[in-house]
Amino acid sequence: GDVYKRQHYTKVKTISFENFPNRSAGFVWGPMESMFNTALQDIYMQQTRLKQAKRGGDLQLSGEITNYDALNKGIGSDGYSSMVELRMTVRVNFVNNSNPAENMNGQQFSASREYNANQQLSAVQDELVTQMIKEIVEQIFNATVANW
């Protein structure tokens, strides 16, 4: 645990983020890009001792939001209301300059949420996108530094 942690922090002190653009082939929702980028940076700032570098960090994250769309799921478990599945996918490139074996190239992370088709997407979008972003950001964090 702690000894391993200390070794990591002696080699790895900084992290840099490139903006993840929203290149969704499906829907494009304006706020999504900044919501995602903020959430991604926040988790590293809050849960590690890494300092943010403008560029060339010991750890580097880049990528893009590749998809945001909805799928009609048909009848829900209640037997009559139909459900819509909202889906979001992010592609991530990760560079660990102190341990290149941990690098990731184009790794995909996804999340989905369902809502009732009787609801307007605009009424639930903010909350559901926030939840999906949180889930994806946690997946990315776990895939990059959680083993510390």
How would you label these PLM feature ranges?
Residues 10-66, 98-102, 139, 144:
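N-terminal segment of the mature soluble domain
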Residues 47-48, 58-104, 108-123:
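Surface-exposed short loop/turn segments
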Residues 1-4:
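Short, small-residue-biased leader/transition segments that mark boundaries at the very start
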Residues 24, 28-36, 82-86, 121-133:
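Extracytoplasmic/periplasmic, Sec-exported soluble proteins
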Residues 125-148:
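Compositionally biased, intrinsically disordered linkers/stalks adjacent to structured regions
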